[in-house]
Amino acid sequence: MALTKLVDAGAWQVEVAPAGTVQDSLVFLSPRNFGGVPGTGVDSVAAIEAALAAGDVDLGGEHWFISRPIYCVSGRTIQNGKISTLAAQGSGFMAGSIFAPGNYHPVYVDPVPKLACSSTNGSATITVSSHEFVVGDLVRLSSTRGIIGSDAVLVPWYMQLARVVGVSGDTVKLDAPIDTTETLVVHKATPAGYNARFNKPLFVLERATFRNIEVDTWDYWTADSATFECAFEGIRGKARSVVYGNTFCRTNFDNIDITFSNKASEMAFGSHDTNLSNIKFRADSQNWDSTNSVGISWAESGRRCTLDNWQLLVPQGVNLSVLVRISSHRDVQIRKGFIQVHSSSNNILSVEHYGGDRPPCNNILFEDIDVNATGAAAVVVDVYKSANDSAINAVRFEGISYRGATPSVALMRQRGTTSNQVTGVRASLYSANGGAFLVSSAMAWDVRLYGPGLQVPAAVAVLGRTAVLSASRSNLHALRWVTEAIIGVTSTTPGNVLREAVIPAGTLRASDYIDFVISGSTGGATSTKDVLVGVLDSGSNFQGVGFTAPTTEESYYTVQGRISFPTTGNCLITATIGRAGVGVSYARTLVSISNYTTNDVKLQVQAWVGSSAGSLSVQHGCFAPSELTG
């Protein structure tokens, strides 16, 4: 079936393919009408580009072949079909790519002349002299400092694409605020007269949509990129990477399912405000290329990028250098993910900074991520400052769950330098088979670890807050004793045990402590009254703090304090003892106990009266282990 479509240059026949609709054919163009031949292995790249130059393109559910990347057109949509490369594997870097959605690379952007401009952090206006910007222009801002990359050109500390929405003399108004205090320069994002890879004009792709397309290539399916307000939806197939490129800005990737042979994702060279959702990264063990292979690795001055609802599937035979790494990005959220990996010899989730003129890793969130390692794993979570000027701040790992072999190095690791420590990391991690918590030049963290067999060195307790909750420590729940009922003490046996709790061997950590409160009243003028709180020492003798009320005392009392474990062989008991009409006293005792990693620890509350004529009651009692709250 064919319909006639009128355009400025005349008319042509529009084919309605079986996978399309009449409405699609009325709105979209087919490469067939520009000489393209689907399904035969004929090179149709020129026909597809010609169709895109004329309007939106529908591939009609057919299979198309190309000999080089398709250079896309701003404002266009291409949808509904399969595209395979004809380029021979190894014929050249990105020669087998499917699309070129923009084509930034530091080597090609660096020579573009730039104008000095001034602004303030949070302002949407810049001041720039002798410019030619007009409303509607897309501009690129970048800092004057940065790092010199492997290609010997500048990778700026800060980069931003923005639309010009107002011009008044030297004042240029942008559609988004500046997000830095750096010294900036500016230029047109698509400058005239400058070429990039394959000698194609340097450009940024704006407001284009790629929808429901299967890609088939040994190369990256996106070549050098630079996008602004673009959308990639329903992309599937196989390629060297899943989401890969430079300068993805205000761009969305949704429902992407690609089998990759080298990298899961790299977003580099100033990617910002870009969101990835519903992504499946499937490593291809049959066609794996281990050269510089990584999982998800975001670097080079990015910010405000997100990844939601994703899977990273890494079978046996694929060993990535790192699974998910954030470096020189800020304001990143990676949430609701699942990682299935056979073996990992390095880090699974990491934040790393290598110093120099790189932007800091600030405000990084990993949340609700399940990791399943069927073989071996080295480190599950890692935070690393390699240099004295590395910058990492406000990093959080929330709701991370690990199942698999005990990590050979660490469940969680923090590493800094002597003069530049890692600080302020917050985390909650579960491990089904334990693992170590390792710290080197780090402090002031707040970490909660869940699961059996967790290893936390006693020495780190004073450096940060570490809560360890595990099934092997479940008997600590026996310590959570609260009574509001009045207990009358009638025993006249010294050392009468009113309450005992046993902490099993291997349960305690140096960061644990137990708060206690015992309160009540004494009476009777013919008998002493004793109340003590303590532990059994290494010789099984009771050692504690408390009071003995004389025969004439009739009073209300409160014994309130804390039991802590500063070393594996010592217990420190401190208490404040208040008795109405008597005053307040303080008690402190250090008790030598058997090593709690291999021996039980017994806590006791003892109470007795000197004779049956004495009156002693406990009206409130409470043991509250710190690590089982909240």
Curated annotation (Swiss-Prot):
Keywords of this entry: Degradation of host capsule during virus entry, Degradation of host cell envelope components during virus entry, Host-virus interaction, Viral attachment to host adhesion receptor, Viral attachment to host cell, Viral tail protein, Virion, Virus entry into host cell
Locations listed in the record: Virion
One of the protein's GO biological processes: adhesion receptor-mediated virion attachment to host cell
Keyword Cell wall biogenesis/degradation attached: no
Gene Ontology cellular component list: virus tail
Signal sequence bounds: none
Keyword Nucleotide-binding among record annotations: no
Domain of life of the source: Viruses
Function: Functions as a receptor binding protein (RBP) and probably mediates the attachment to the host capsular exopolysaccharides. Displays a depolymerase activity that specifically degrades the K63-type polysaccharides of Klebsiella pneumoniae capsule.
Family membership noted in the UniProt record: Belongs to the K63-specific depolymerase family.
UniProt subunit comment: Homotrimer.
Name the record gives this protein: Depolymerase, capsule K63-specific
Gene source species: Klebsiella phage KP34
Gene name, Swiss-Prot/TrEMBL: 57
